[in-house]
Each structure stands twice: as C-alpha cells, then as structure tokens.
A protein has these predicted regions:
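Catalytic core segments in nucleotide and nucleic-acid processing enzymes
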Residues: 2-101
Length: 101
C-alpha cells in the first residue's frame, strides 16, 4: 500500500560514534531511507565509467566504506549508490556488488 511507505531524506538517527563523553560523533546521513523496506540509498555526483572494471568503474573506496557503515547501523541488506547518467554510464549495467561479511 502506498500509505505504508515512509521515506526519509537526509536521515540523522545514527552516528558512527554513539558515545564519546556522552555525545554522539560523526553523524551518519544517508540521502534516502525507505523505512518500511529498510532500503538505504545514497546519491553521488561523480562520473562513473561502466567500461572501467579494473578501476572499479570509478566508484570510490570511501563511498563503499560509507555504504558499509550504513548497512551496519541501519541493519540493511538493500543498499544503493545512485549516480548521474553520462555518456560513459548509460544504463544500470554494472553487476551488483556484495559485501564480504
């Protein structure tokens, strides 16, 4: 049902450090959280090259670490990085990545 969808933008419920001198530190802020399905999405304004498999398609290691932290804190297995379409990234043709846990 459409009314069951709760979408949060720039969600700020969690921090990387929950208690340091009784304060939260390093606030997490995924761009989109679909709560009823526990889906985390983060938008990136970077150029992806779907032909550059050796260079991880231009996906940064820092972005993958960030998504991993979101997976842990939100207890989510459905995580997406969203990139703009360019002449080197025309369709979502890159195979999914799976974290080695």
């Amino acid at each position: 049902k459409k009314s069951d969808w709760e979408i949060r933008t720039q969600d700020r419920r969690f921090s990387l450090i929950e208690s340091h001198k009784s304060k939260q530190k390093f606030q997490l802020r995924p761009d989109i959280v679909i709560q009823n399905e526990n889906i985390i999405m983060d938008t990136k304004w970077k150029i992806i090259d779907e032909t550059d498999e050796a260079g991880n398609y231009g996906i940064s290691q820092a972005d993958m670490y960030q998504l991993y932290v979101y997976a842990q804190k939100y207890r989510s297995k459905k995580l997406y990085l969203i990139y703009p379409q360019t002449d080197k990234f025309l369709s979502p043709s890159i195979a999914p990545f799976y974290y080695n846990t």
